[in-house]
Amino acid sequence: GASQYHLARTWWADGYEARAEAGEWPTPAAYLAEFARVTETRRLSLAEWASARAAAMTRIDGSMVALRRASELGVVSLLSNNPAATASALPILAPDVVEILGRNQLFSYMLGARKPGEEIYRRALAHYGVDAADAFLADDSLANVEGARSVGMTAFQLLRVDGQFQTDALLAAVETFAARSR
Protein backbone atom coordinates (compact mmCIF):
# COMPACT_ATOMS: atom_id res chain seq x y z
CA GLY A 1 0.00 0.00 0.00
CA ALA A 2 0.83 3.64 -0.21
CA SER A 3 -0.46 6.72 1.55
CA GLN A 4 -3.11 8.86 -0.04
CA TYR A 5 -0.53 11.64 -0.20
CA HIS A 6 1.89 9.49 -2.19
CA LEU A 7 -0.89 8.46 -4.58
CA ALA A 8 -2.11 12.04 -4.93
CA ARG A 9 1.39 13.30 -5.68
CA THR A 10 2.48 10.56 -8.07
CA TRP A 11 -0.77 9.81 -9.90
CA TRP A 12 -3.22 12.68 -9.71
CA ALA A 13 -0.99 15.74 -9.37
CA ASP A 14 1.21 14.61 -12.25
CA GLY A 15 -1.81 14.28 -14.54
CA TYR A 16 -1.94 10.52 -14.98
CA GLU A 17 -5.59 10.21 -13.99
CA ALA A 18 -6.59 12.91 -16.48
CA ARG A 19 -4.63 11.07 -19.18
CA ALA A 20 -6.38 7.82 -18.26
CA GLU A 21 -9.74 9.57 -18.38
CA ALA A 22 -8.90 10.79 -21.88
CA GLY A 23 -8.24 7.22 -23.01
CA GLU A 24 -4.46 6.80 -22.85
CA TRP A 25 -4.84 3.41 -21.12
CA PRO A 26 -8.00 2.05 -22.77
CA THR A 27 -8.42 -1.16 -20.78
CA PRO A 28 -8.67 -1.86 -17.05
CA ALA A 29 -5.52 -4.02 -17.26
CA ALA A 30 -3.52 -1.25 -18.93
CA TYR A 31 -4.80 1.32 -16.42
CA LEU A 32 -4.01 -0.84 -13.39
CA ALA A 33 -0.55 -1.72 -14.73
CA GLU A 34 0.31 1.94 -15.34
CA PHE A 35 -1.07 2.92 -11.94
CA ALA A 36 1.20 0.35 -10.26
CA ARG A 37 4.22 1.45 -12.31
CA VAL A 38 3.79 5.16 -11.65
CA THR A 39 2.91 4.86 -7.96
CA GLU A 40 5.47 2.11 -7.35
CA THR A 41 2.86 -0.06 -5.67
CA ARG A 42 1.82 -3.63 -6.36
CA ARG A 43 -0.62 -4.19 -9.19
CA LEU A 44 -4.16 -4.32 -7.87
CA SER A 45 -6.82 -6.62 -9.22
CA LEU A 46 -9.91 -4.92 -10.60
CA ALA A 47 -11.85 -6.11 -7.52
CA GLU A 48 -9.26 -4.57 -5.16
CA TRP A 49 -9.24 -1.34 -7.13
CA ALA A 50 -13.06 -1.25 -7.14
CA SER A 51 -13.13 -1.73 -3.37
CA ALA A 52 -10.80 1.23 -2.86
CA ARG A 53 -12.75 3.31 -5.37
CA ALA A 54 -16.05 2.50 -3.63
CA ALA A 55 -14.62 3.70 -0.32
CA ALA A 56 -13.81 7.06 -1.92
CA MET A 57 -17.28 7.56 -3.44
CA THR A 58 -20.18 9.50 -1.93
CA ARG A 59 -23.63 8.17 -2.69
CA ILE A 60 -26.32 10.79 -3.25
CA ASP A 61 -29.60 8.93 -2.78
CA GLY A 62 -31.80 11.79 -3.97
CA SER A 63 -29.98 11.75 -7.29
CA MET A 64 -31.16 8.16 -7.76
CA VAL A 65 -34.76 9.35 -7.42
CA ALA A 66 -34.12 11.93 -10.14
CA LEU A 67 -32.37 9.35 -12.36
CA ARG A 68 -35.27 6.92 -12.01
CA ARG A 69 -37.77 9.66 -12.82
CA ALA A 70 -35.75 10.83 -15.82
CA SER A 71 -35.69 7.24 -17.11
CA GLU A 72 -39.50 7.24 -17.00
CA LEU A 73 -39.58 10.44 -19.05
CA GLY A 74 -36.97 9.61 -21.69
CA VAL A 75 -33.62 8.02 -22.41
CA VAL A 76 -30.97 8.40 -19.71
CA SER A 77 -27.22 7.98 -19.96
CA LEU A 78 -24.13 8.42 -17.86
CA LEU A 79 -21.41 10.76 -19.13
CA SER A 80 -18.50 10.49 -16.75
CA ASN A 81 -14.86 11.58 -16.61
CA ASN A 82 -13.42 8.20 -15.68
CA PRO A 83 -10.95 5.59 -16.90
CA ALA A 84 -11.63 2.09 -18.21
CA ALA A 85 -11.31 0.54 -14.75
CA THR A 86 -14.28 2.55 -13.49
CA ALA A 87 -16.38 1.55 -16.47
CA SER A 88 -15.63 -2.12 -15.90
CA ALA A 89 -16.26 -1.84 -12.17
CA LEU A 90 -19.49 0.17 -12.40
CA PRO A 91 -21.70 -2.91 -11.87
CA ILE A 92 -19.87 -3.44 -8.56
CA LEU A 93 -19.72 0.24 -7.60
CA ALA A 94 -23.30 1.19 -8.47
CA PRO A 95 -25.44 -1.78 -9.53
CA ASP A 96 -28.65 0.22 -9.14
CA VAL A 97 -27.35 2.86 -11.55
CA VAL A 98 -26.39 0.19 -14.08
CA GLU A 99 -29.86 -1.33 -13.76
CA ILE A 100 -31.43 1.98 -14.78
CA LEU A 101 -28.89 2.93 -17.45
CA GLY A 102 -28.48 -0.41 -19.14
CA ARG A 103 -25.88 0.05 -21.86
CA ASN A 104 -26.25 3.84 -21.90
CA GLN A 105 -22.91 4.51 -20.25
CA LEU A 106 -20.33 6.82 -21.77
CA PHE A 107 -16.98 7.38 -20.14
CA SER A 108 -14.44 9.97 -21.14
CA TYR A 109 -11.83 7.31 -21.91
CA MET A 110 -14.19 5.93 -24.60
CA LEU A 111 -14.70 9.33 -26.20
CA GLY A 112 -11.09 10.52 -26.02
CA ALA A 113 -12.12 13.78 -24.40
CA ARG A 114 -12.92 15.06 -20.92
CA LYS A 115 -15.50 17.35 -19.40
CA PRO A 116 -15.67 20.32 -19.38
CA GLY A 117 -14.30 20.48 -22.93
CA GLU A 118 -16.94 20.96 -25.60
CA GLU A 119 -15.73 17.99 -27.64
CA ILE A 120 -16.90 15.38 -25.15
CA TYR A 121 -20.44 16.74 -25.28
CA ARG A 122 -20.42 16.82 -29.08
CA ARG A 123 -19.17 13.23 -29.22
CA ALA A 124 -21.78 12.07 -26.69
CA LEU A 125 -24.57 13.77 -28.62
CA ALA A 126 -23.33 12.22 -31.87
CA HIS A 127 -23.10 8.80 -30.22
CA TYR A 128 -26.81 8.92 -29.38
CA GLY A 129 -27.87 10.90 -32.45
CA VAL A 130 -29.42 13.59 -30.26
CA ASP A 131 -29.63 17.34 -30.88
CA ALA A 132 -28.11 19.41 -28.10
CA ALA A 133 -31.46 21.17 -27.57
CA ASP A 134 -32.96 17.79 -26.64
CA ALA A 135 -30.29 16.85 -24.10
CA PHE A 136 -30.10 17.51 -20.36
CA LEU A 137 -26.98 17.19 -18.21
CA ALA A 138 -26.82 17.23 -14.41
CA ASP A 139 -23.42 17.64 -12.79
CA ASP A 140 -22.01 18.97 -9.54
CA SER A 141 -19.25 20.86 -11.37
CA LEU A 142 -20.03 24.35 -12.63
CA ALA A 143 -17.32 24.01 -15.29
CA ASN A 144 -18.97 20.85 -16.62
CA VAL A 145 -22.40 22.51 -16.63
CA GLU A 146 -20.99 25.49 -18.52
CA GLY A 147 -19.29 23.14 -21.00
CA ALA A 148 -22.60 21.43 -21.74
CA ARG A 149 -24.40 24.74 -22.08
CA SER A 150 -21.74 25.99 -24.49
CA VAL A 151 -22.83 23.36 -27.03
CA GLY A 152 -26.53 24.10 -26.55
CA MET A 153 -27.51 21.51 -23.95
CA THR A 154 -29.72 22.25 -20.97
CA ALA A 155 -27.59 21.72 -17.88
CA PHE A 156 -28.21 21.76 -14.15
CA GLN A 157 -25.61 22.15 -11.42
CA LEU A 158 -26.29 19.95 -8.40
CA LEU A 159 -25.34 22.15 -5.48
CA ARG A 160 -24.42 21.23 -1.94
CA VAL A 161 -25.86 23.60 0.65
CA ASP A 162 -25.05 23.16 4.33
CA GLY A 163 -23.65 19.73 3.54
CA GLN A 164 -26.77 18.55 1.70
CA PHE A 165 -27.07 18.04 -2.03
CA GLN A 166 -30.09 19.88 -3.41
CA THR A 167 -31.67 16.84 -5.04
CA ASP A 168 -35.21 18.25 -4.86
CA ALA A 169 -34.04 21.02 -7.18
CA LEU A 170 -32.50 18.38 -9.46
CA LEU A 171 -35.77 16.49 -9.65
CA ALA A 172 -37.62 19.73 -10.40
CA ALA A 173 -35.13 20.53 -13.18
CA VAL A 174 -35.69 17.08 -14.71
CA GLU A 175 -39.46 17.61 -14.64
CA THR A 176 -39.13 21.11 -16.13
CA PHE A 177 -36.91 19.86 -18.94
CA ALA A 178 -39.27 17.00 -19.76
CA ALA A 179 -42.27 19.34 -19.81
CA ARG A 180 -40.72 21.96 -22.12
CA SER A 181 -42.48 22.68 -25.38
CA ARG A 182 -40.73 21.28 -28.40
Task: Walk through the language-model features, giving the residues of each.
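Asp-based, Mg2+/Mn2+-dependent phosphohydrolase catalytic module
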Residues: R68, L79, P83-R182
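N-terminal helical cap/lid subdomain that shapes the substrate entry/recognition surface
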Residues: G1-M64, E72, P83
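Glycine-centered short loops/turns at secondary-structure junctions
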Residues: L73-G74, G152
